[in-house]
C-alpha cells in the first residue's frame, strides 16, 4: 500500500475522535497520531504535512506541532515501519470480514 492510502486509513480512524482537535487535547493527540504514522512507516515530512493540514486550522502553533511530531518519531524510532504490513486495501478488508461470517 502507498503512504497516501495508509494516511487515508489512519485519517478515518483519527477523525472518529473529534475531541482530539479541541484545545487541551491537541498536543497529546498530535504525539499519538505521529506515533501511528511512524509505526506505519510514513516519512516524517509526510506526517508533518498531514498533521499540519488537520491541526493548523484549529489554531495550533506550527512550531509546537513540528516539535511534537519530531519528539514522537524520535521516541518511537525503533518502531518505524513495524506495523506497515498491518494495513490492507478496503476491498481486501471487506472480503476477509465477509469470509469470517
Residue ranges: model-predicted function:
Residues 1-100:
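Modules that initiate DNA replication and primer synthesis
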Amino acid at each position: 500500500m502507498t503512504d497516501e492510502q495508509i494516511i487515508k486509513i489512519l485519517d478515518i480512524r483519527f477523525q472518529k475522535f473529534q475531541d482530539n482537535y479541541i484545545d487541551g487535547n491537541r498536543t497529546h493527540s498530535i504525539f499519538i497520531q505521529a506515533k501511528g504514522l511512524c509505526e506505519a512507516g510514513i516519512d516524517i515530512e509526510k506526517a508533518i504535512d498531514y498533521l499540519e493540514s488537520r491541526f493548523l486550522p484549529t489554531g495550533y502553533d506550527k512550531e509546537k506541532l513540528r516539535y511534537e511530531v519530531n519528539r514522537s518519531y524520535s521516541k518511537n524510532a525503533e518502531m518505524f515501519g513495524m506495523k506497515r504490513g498491518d494495513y490492507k486495501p478496503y476491498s481486501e478488508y471487506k472480503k476477509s470480514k465477509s469470509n469470517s461470517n
